[in-house]
A protein has these predicted regions:
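A short alpha-helical cap/connector motif
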Residues: 1-117, 124-137
Length: 137
C-alpha cells in the first residue's frame, strides 16, 4: 500500500502529530494502521470500542473518524502527560472517554462482553492479560 493513497486523514491527526513530535513521543500509530482502524470502527455501527494505549491520541483519532454517532470509545493509558495531548485534541467528542490507569486493571474490572472491538496498542491485552481482553468481546 502506498501511503499517498491515504487521502482522508482525520483533521485532528496533523495537530496530534505536531504535539507528539514536540514531546518526543515515538509510539504513535502509522497512517496505514490508522486507516485500517477507521475501517474496523466503521464495521461496528453503534459499537462499543476499546483502545488500550491511548498515547497522544493518534489511534483514537482514526477510530473516531470511522465511528458512527452512536458508537463509543473508551481509551486507556497510564501516562497522564500523553493522554493530556489526546484530551486536548479529541476531548470535545462526546463519544470518547479517557481513562488514565493501568490497562490490566481496567481489563480486570470491566464486565465481560462489554466491547465490540478492542485495539490493543499497549502491553496489557497484547502481550499480557490477553484472556482478560478477549473476555470483554
Amino acid at each position: 500500500m502506498n501511503d499517498s493513497e491515504i487521502r482522508r486523514q482525520p483533521a485532528t491527526v496533523a495537530d496530534i502529530v505536531v504535539d507528539t513530535e514536540a514531546r518526543g513521543f515515538n509510539m504513535a500509530s502509522e497512517p496505514r494502521v490508522g486507516a485500517f482502524l477507521a475501517v474496523l470502527a466503521a464495521s461496528k455501527p453503534g459499537g462499543r470500542l476499546l483502545e488500550l494505549g491511548t498515547g497522544t491520541g493518534h489511534g483514537a483519532a482514526w477510530l473516531l473518524a470511522g465511528m458512527d454517532p452512536a458508537s463509543t470509545l473508551d481509551t486507556v493509558d497510564t501516562d497522564a502527560n500523553v493522554v493530556a495531548v489526546a484530551q486536548r485534541h479529541l476531548g470535545s467528542d462526546r463519544r470518547v472517554r479517557f481513562h488514565v490507569m493501568d490497562g490490566a486493571q481496567f481489563l480486570q474490572q470491566t464486565p465481560s462482553n462489554h466491547f465490540d472491538l478492542i485495539y490493543a496498542d499497549a502491553w496489557p491485552g497484547k502481550f499480557s492479560h490477553l484472556d482478560d481482553a478477549l473476555s470483554l468481546l
